[in-house]
Amino acid sequence: MKITHVLRGVEWQLSTPKHLMIYQAFGWTPPKYAHLPLIMNNDGTKLSKRQGDIHVEHFMKMGYYSDALLNYITLPGGGFTKGDNEVLKLDELVKIFDISTVKRSSGRLDPAHLDRLNQLFIQRKIADGEMNELTEQIRKIVMSKYSGNISLDDLSTEYLEQIMCWCQNRISRLDELAGSDFEFLWLKPDKIDISNIDISNPLEVLQSCIECVRNMDTFDESSVGSEMKKNAKRMKVKFAPYMKFLRMCLSGLKEGPSVGEIMTVLGKSKTLERLKHASCICEEKESRTRTES
């Protein structure tokens, strides 16, 4: 068979003398044996095929990419001189493999590290300009979660790419974008709770803010922050409650990303839509209050 080298798990080490004697009995030249350390669970127990969460299908359904999984299972055993903050493709791993750096002790799989590797993979795809696959996956995830409340027109490639660049340090799997923390990216808030926000004239503030945003030529985080500060001063409203109020109007969140971040990732057009939507809600509230009184 002309086999010169055998690499196998360390559990075969005790059987090696028997195998060598068999070769000797037949007068054959034995191959060179190397015994590799086992890959264990994070708690030190052995991996088992009876574990439901150890199958590749499980990880794929969870939204992990094959390159992230590949790096995840190669790191614990060694053999690769690469940093922890990079994800390499299979052909790249083949080129740098060095058996002399294989570890002697068993390695452990840390699920948190898989999340980090998956995040790094997403970041690499973005850095390499390979975003078509990512945006198409996000489109399917969001349409599946919010079908009936959102249309494909709301999920343009340009908008999804903008979101990916913004959230690449915030997520490790694309399906997280369908979670409650990121719902504001897809849906307008259906109610605005300003009961604990010190804003006495919400409708006037919103109308002023709409005009301010409409007149902005440059729409980046720095410019937005600067203009909102000026507008708060013009309206004689304290800056902190003013920004809390705008965050609530734009996202429905009491806490979360800054107003500058939210406006920038939504873009000027969607920001104006949200502010006008919030203005309608506030106007209806004021109308009901006048009627009741």
Annotate the PLM regions:
Residues 1-6, 54, 209, 227-229, ...:
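Glycine- and acidic
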Residues 14, 24-191, 251-292:
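Catalytic adenosine-cofactor/nucleotide-binding cores of aminoacyl-tRNA synthetases and other
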